[in-house]
Amino acid sequence: MDNAGKEREAVQLMAEAEKRVKASHSFLRGLFGGNTRIEEACEMYTRAANMFKMAKNWSAAGNAFCQAAKLHMQLQSKHDSATSFVDAGNAYKKADPQEAINCLNAAIDIYTDMGRFTIAAKHHITIAEIYETELVDIEKAIAHYEQSADYYKGEESNSANKCLLKVAAYAAQLEQYQKAIEIYEQVGANTMDNPLLKYSAKDYFFKAALCHFIVDELNAKLALEKYEEMFPAFTDSRECKLLKKLLEAHEEQNSEAYTEAVKEFDSISRLDQWLTTMLLRIKKSIQGDGEGDGDLK
C-alpha cells in the first residue's frame, strides 16, 4: 500500500473511532458496554496513528496518539495513557516541536503521579533536547535538565550528573558562573572517589577553576589550591599545569605567554567550543579593554 493508501485507511479508522466515542455517550450505551466502545476507539486511534506514521504524516500521527491517550485516561488506564502521550510526542517531534513538548509534559504528569520518577526524568531530557536543538531556548533547556537531575538523584546518580553537567555548561555560557562552579565542584567531588569515574574529576575541577578565573584571578588561585588539596591527582594533570601557566601570564598581563600555553595544551588535547569560549573570555581581561584579535592561536 502506498502512502496515500495508508493515509486513506488512517482517516477511515479515525472516523470509525469517533463514531465509537459518540456511541459510548448515548444513555443506553453508557449503561451497557460504553467502556467497550471506548476501548475499541482507543485501538482504532492507535492503528490510525501507526498508519499515519508509515505515511510520514507526523502531525496526524501525533494527533491520533493524543486522542488514544485521552481515552485511555477516561478508562483509568494511566500507564497506557502515558505511553500514548509519549508516542504522540515522538511523532510531533518531527513536525511540531512545541506540540511534542505539550504531549511529553502530559506523559510526565502521569508518570510523576504514579511515582515513576526515573521515566519522567528521561522525558524531561527529551524536552530539554528539543529546546536545545529545535526551539533554541537555553533557559528552558536548563530548567528541564535540572528537573531531570532532581528526579534521577538517589536512583541513578550517573544520569543525574550528566544532566547537571549540561546545566553547568549552559550556565557558564550565560555568565551564571557561580551556578556553574557549584555544579562542577559537586560533580567533581562525587566522581573523584569512584575508581571508574575519577579520571573525569580533573576535567570538572578544571572547568570550575576557569569559571572562577573569569570572575576573579585571586578566586581562581584559591580554588586551584583547594582542588589540589581535595584531589592530589589533579596536581600532575595537564589541566592543572595549564591553569598555573595561565594564572602566571594573567598576573604579568602577558597575552603572548597566555596564548602560547593554550596552543601547547591544544596541540595534545583539542579544545572544544566551550573551553575555547571560556579561555577567550579570560584572555580579554588580559588585553584590558577587550581589544586584540579575539583569538587563542
From Swiss-Prot:
InterPro entries: NSF_attach, TPR-like_helical_dom_sf. Keywords: ER-Golgi transport, Membrane, Protein transport, Transport. This is Beta-soluble NSF attachment protein. It comes from the Eukaryota. Belongs to the SNAP family. It comes from Rattus norvegicus. GO terms for cellular component: glutamatergic synapse; postsynapse; presynapse; presynaptic active zone membrane; synaptobrevin 2-SNAP-25-syntaxin-1a complex. Interacts with PRKCABP, and disrupts the interaction between GRIA2 and PRKCABP, leading to the internalization of GRIA2.
